[in-house]
């Protein structure tokens, strides 16, 4: 009970440190009176917790954030506020930034005095924010080791997300990587009796920014073994072009011409490489302010931008939309209170890029048909491009030239008050073996609009008409050879294979939110063909809502093709269930297709485990007199995932096992982990076995000190390790690392660790007053090795096998403990116990030899990422 007020005081201190946002020149707003503490903590020095930033002066590795967005992670010098010219008598330490750090934080250095900027750059000295930027503020979060800075927008370059330069991209290390997925199935009875094993392999080798990749499949079944290499490629980046270069098996995007595969080369711009501010189209907001006004921009009721503008015309293009589509409502409030409101149209389904931006792609090689490797492979070249000619207006086009085939495309997309639209035309010329040349055209129109009043979203994804002489490249090649096997440069007739070519396409989707009553959507598709009376049509109507905790979905569809017309009605209900150690959901459905019996099903699926690593489920499905029962479960661990399923019906049973995993071979050995198909982070944390990766399902550090984690390319990735499961003698000097990887790279994430000797310093009865809360413990050299917590004890790290520890009491006297860990007793968690015995205060200094009594482990204050010793250089 004596420790309760002490815990409360610590909580208040940390709450002030985490929540306060005092400027460096702000006086202490609160005072913690040590007289309110009970027991030996009475009289402890708590003055430094009177401030939101309770750090002592020194160098600390911290994560710097601006407006809750991560900027950089660097070692920052903290100086006493009174030495920074603030004139405080008692004050916290404040951050002091160098020229390089200010530049990395993307502040507007041109707004400062040029002489001051030149001095910072040449001298290498640092300066506090309060001297550089008026009204700037800072606060430090002990628990997160996070320095939050607030700088007025006038002094910042990017108001929302920090743009990333190609110079910051990390190409990664030399490594071999392998991802695998397997499936084993045993069918008993029914039409598919037998066993089958399939294995998918995704392998690669990375070397100095070049990435070799191969995807292959292996299969065993019905007494046969099959192996197939699906794709092999070698790729790298061209940073100055913001483009990627690929050799080998490549695929066309399908954005301009119908997609196809080829073996050759492809080079083209990649939007993921662009700065954040250029990746997403957004219309420029233009207006005129009569006075110094406040501008607010709303999208779907969400505030996406707010800033003050001077009198005169203004143009705003550095905001982040809440969604890709939906008109923007602009509210301009003048200094005299007058308000003007206007709307800027913004729609999304039609692709648009920013004014002045150009995106392009070029490919050349031989056509590849995975279904017929023996087919003749014509050479093909494709060039496409898109350019933003004005705000909301794009021109795009392309050329495709191949043996016996040529095509050209030109189009325009634009944003209007009535919605976003795009229109293009494609002309083709095909040399067919029987009928000679076939010339044709294909017209396409797209439209999208979100109605602001009702929030109705309209997507006319495709309205296309193709003439009888129009062929796309893949259709012409796949028509098959006729007599000459295509060696005369002509293609066979498509109709000879009994296949029709598309004539017209129409598709539309509407969605309508109904507030608290759910949402409604309608979609329709119609397709006609040349050379046939075939018509494919599909209509779907859906409604979803929430009734209490029950989710309700109703779907009605009609599908019509040449063979049949089918109607289907389906009702789904889902009920979430929550328990102390697990969670799950019960789903039930009723479905009726045509005149078939009503199909009923009830399923339960759940998750359990500390990190939801276990999933399980069971279900029953009934239609008429037949029933099917299913049972499944899965496990996700550090080294992969495994799942199994058992299905049993009236005349058949099926057993199925699926799994996946991956590995990376590098200079430090071979590290196993979960399946990774993209960019990989290789965690290196020596002696930190068991440390888990925060915000991942089950990634962790293995016994060799390595781990694997998935990363997002060309973006700032923050990977955090949890020290919760580490032994007390191992300390992570850094729990968070940041990296900006290239696509496909294996990037090293080095977490420095300290494997120090740790011990427990415990005050003997009668000496508790020497080891009160917050008291620093130093070794014989004067280095801080620990801070006292509760229970008149302190966890000390980095101590030698024998020596002296000392603490300074409130009256200035020093109490020492001489120890030898070889003869010390064992405390909780196997740590050696060092006893501290002191004379009453005022009685001078007194040393104490080590004793072997065990004590309970106390709590202690620690600062993540840096030793407690102030390091002012």
Swiss-Prot record:
Membrane topology: Multi-pass membrane protein
Record-given protein name: Outer membrane usher protein FimC
Function per UniProt: Probable porin-like protein necessary for the assembly of a pilin-type protein.
Pfam families, per the entry: PapC_C, PapC_N, Usher
Location relative to the cell: Cell outer membrane
GO terms (BP aspect): pilus assembly
Domain of life: Bacteria
Protein keywords: Cell outer membrane, Disulfide bond, Fimbrium biogenesis, Membrane, Signal, Transmembrane, Transmembrane beta strand, Transport
Signal sequence, start to end: 1-15
């Amino acid at each position: 009970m004596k420790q309760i007020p002490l815990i409360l005081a610590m909580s208040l201190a940390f709450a002030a440190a985490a929540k306060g946002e005092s400027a460096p020149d702000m006086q202490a707003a609160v005072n913690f009176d040590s007289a309110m503490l009970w027991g030996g903590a009475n009289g402890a020095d708590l003055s430094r917790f009177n401030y939101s930033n309770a750090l002592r002066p020194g160098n600390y590795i911290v994560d710097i954030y601006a407006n809750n967005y991560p900027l950089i992670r660097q070692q920052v010098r903290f100086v006493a506020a009174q030495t920074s010219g603030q004139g405080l008598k008692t004050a916290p330490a404040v951050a002091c930034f160098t020229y390089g750090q200010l530049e990395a934080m993307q502040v507007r250095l041109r707004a400062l005095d040029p002489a001051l900027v030149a001095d910072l750059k040449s001298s290498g000295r640092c300066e506090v924010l309060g001297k550089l930027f008026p009204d700037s503020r800072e606060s430090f979060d002990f628990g997160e080791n996070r320095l939050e800075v607030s700088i007025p927008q006038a002094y910042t370059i990017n108001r929302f997300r920090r743009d990333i330069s190609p110079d910051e991209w990390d190409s990664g290390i030399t490594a071999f990587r392998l991802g695998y997925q397997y499936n084993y199935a045993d069918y008993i009875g029914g039409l598919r009796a037998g066993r089958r094993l399939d294995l998918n392999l995704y392998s690669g080798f990375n070397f100095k920014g070049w990435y070799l990749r191969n995807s292959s499949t292996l299969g065993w079944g019905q007494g046969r073994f099959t192996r197939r290499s699906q794709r092999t490629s070698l790729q790298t980046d061209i940073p100055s072009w913001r483009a990627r270069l690929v050799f080998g098996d490549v695929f066309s995007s399908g954005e301009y011409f119908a997609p196809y595969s080829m073996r050759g080369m492809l080079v083209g711009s990649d939007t993921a490489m662009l700065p954040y501010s250029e990746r997403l189209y957004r219309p420029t907001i233009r207006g005129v302010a009569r006075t110094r006004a406040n501008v607010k921009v709303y999208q779907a009721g969400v505030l996406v931008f707010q800033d003050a503008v001077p009198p005169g015309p203004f143009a705003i293009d550095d905001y982040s939309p809440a969604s890709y589509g939906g008109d923007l409502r602009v509210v301009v409030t003048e200094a005299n209170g007058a308000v003007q409101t206007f709307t800027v149209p913004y729609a999304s389904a039609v692709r648009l890029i920013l004014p002045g931006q150009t995106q392009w792609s070029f490919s050349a090689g031989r056509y590849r048909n995975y279904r017929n490797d023996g087919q003749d492979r014509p050479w093909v070249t494709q060039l496409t491009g898109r350019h933003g000619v004005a705000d909301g207006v794009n021109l795009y086009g392309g050329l495709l030239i191949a043996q016996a085939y040529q095509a050209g495309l030109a189009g325009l997309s634009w944003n209007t008050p009535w919605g976003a639209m795009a229109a293009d035309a494609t002309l083709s010329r095909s040399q067919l073996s029987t009928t000679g040349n076939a010339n044709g055209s294909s017209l396409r129109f797209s439209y999208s609009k979100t109605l602001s009043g009702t929030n109705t979203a309209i997507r006319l994804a495709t309205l296309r008409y193709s003439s009888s002489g129009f062929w796309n490249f893949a259709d012409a090649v796949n028509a098959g050879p006729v007599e000459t096997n295509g060696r005369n440069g002509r293609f066979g007739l498509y109709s000879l294979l009994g296949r029709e070519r598309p004539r017209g396409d129409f598709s539309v989707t509407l969605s309508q939110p109904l507030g608290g009553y759910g949402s409604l959507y309608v979609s329709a598709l119609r397709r006609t063909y040349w050379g046939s009376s075939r018509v494919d049509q599909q209509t779907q109507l859906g409604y979803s809502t929430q009734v209490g905790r029950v989710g309700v979905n109703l779907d009605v569809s009609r599908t019509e093709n040449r063979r049949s017309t089918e109607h289907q009605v389906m009702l789904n209900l889902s009920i979430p269930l929550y328990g102390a150690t697990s969670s799950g959901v019960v789903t039930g459905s009723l479905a009726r297709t045509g005149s078939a019996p009503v199909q009923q099903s009830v399923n339960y699926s759940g998750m359990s485990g500390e990190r939801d690593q276990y999933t399980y489920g069971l279900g029953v499905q009934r239609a008429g007199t037949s029933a099917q029962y299913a049972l499944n479960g899965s496990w996700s661990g550090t080294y992969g995932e495994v799942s199994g399923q058992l299905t049993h019906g009236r005349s058949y049973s099926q057993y199925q096992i699926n799994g996946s995993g991956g590995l990376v071979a590098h200079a430090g050995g071979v590290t196993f982990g979960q399946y990774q198909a993209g960019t990989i982070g290789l965690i290196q944390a020596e002696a930190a076995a068991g440390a888990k990766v925060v915000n991942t399902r089950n990634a962790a550090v293995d016994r060799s000190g390595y781990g694997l984690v998935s990363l997002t390319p060309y973006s700032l990735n923050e990977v955090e390790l949890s020290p919760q499961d580490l032994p007390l003698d191992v300390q992570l000097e850094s729990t968070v690392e940041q990296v900006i990887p290239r696509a496909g790279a294996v990037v090293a994430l080095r977490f420095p660790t300290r494997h120090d000797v740790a011990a427990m310093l415990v005050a003997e009865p009668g000496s508790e007053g020497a080891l009160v809360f917050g008291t620093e413990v130093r070794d014989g050299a004067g280095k801080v090795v620990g801070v006292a917590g509760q229970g008149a004890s302190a966890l000390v790290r980095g101590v030698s096998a024998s020596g002296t520890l000392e603490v300074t009491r409130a009256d200035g006297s020093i109490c020492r403990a001489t120890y030898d860990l070889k003869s010390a007793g064992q405390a909780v968690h196997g740590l050696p116990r060092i006893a501290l015995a002191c004379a009453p205060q005022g009685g001078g200094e007194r040393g104490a030899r080590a004793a072997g009594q065990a004590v309970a482990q106390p709590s202690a204050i620690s600062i993540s990422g840096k030793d407690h010793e102030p390091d002012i250089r």
